[in-house]
Amino acid sequence: DPRFVIVGNHDVPYWSLMARVFSPWKAFERATGHPAHDHEFLSPDLMVRGVVTARGWQARMNWSKGVIDLDQTRQAAEALRQAPVGALRVLACHHPLVEMIGAPMTGEVKRGEAAARIFAEAGVELIATGHVHVPFALPISLADHCSYAVGCGTLSHRERGAPPSFNQIDWDALHITVTAMAWIGDRFEPDQVWRLPRRQDTRLPATAPDPNQAGAMEKAAV
């Protein structure tokens, strides 16, 4: 079965400053067999663009927080615009680009909210993230509000007010259903469910984002 793996801040070597600077993703790539850089999955019904928001080091004290730079944003937006008409367009990254109010921790992604709006302009339906260890689904404030920031829980024992969980995502022409599958001690069971109306503009050639033309917000980004 296809697997799509995104690197996160816990994949960075904690104690070795040299490894953080020069080879932060070596252990991740060796363990998963997947490259730790922006990449994508494409099929007729699904397009997933992965963006690395974790950094080996950065110019602030808390290196666990996220960053998405302008080049990453533009390249991901261009890839999203190339998705087949009608396909579910997903942007996957470790840190939430849109913060959940009341979450036990934050991603504090530099340029995160601006990037989320650019991705929505490019046709994204889901921005799928982790990091905060609790599941959520929030609309992105743009156009018809049918682009969503969706966070998943964690399979770690480091709980932050929610049981260990993962998200199961199902979709049809009209809705996306996100089910947080929580660990109850001996098995996973549905815990929270969000039924999200799908964007309809990306399902028609006449209204889908132009694959050859950047949107206004993307053009204006500096």
Regions found by a protein language model. Give the residues of each.
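Active-site glycine-centered loops adjacent to acidic/histidine catalytic or metal-binding residues
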Residues: 8-9, 94, 131
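Proline-centered loop/turn at the N-terminus of a beta-strand
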Residues: 2-5, 47, 88, 125-126, ...
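Short acidic, glycine-rich surface-loop motifs adjacent to enzyme active sites
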Residues: 80, 84-100
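Extended active-site neighborhood of metal-dependent phosphoesterases/phosphodiesterases
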Residues: 1-78, 83, 118-120, 143, ...
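Conserved beta-sheet core of the metallophosphoesterase superfamily
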Residues: 101-177
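Short, catalytically relevant binding-site loops at active-site mouths
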Residues: 55-57, 95-99, 133-135
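Short, structured patches in soluble enzyme cores that scaffold and shape functional sites
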Residues: 50-55, 93-95, 180-182
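A short C-terminal boundary segment appended to hydrolase-like catalytic domains
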Residues: 171-222
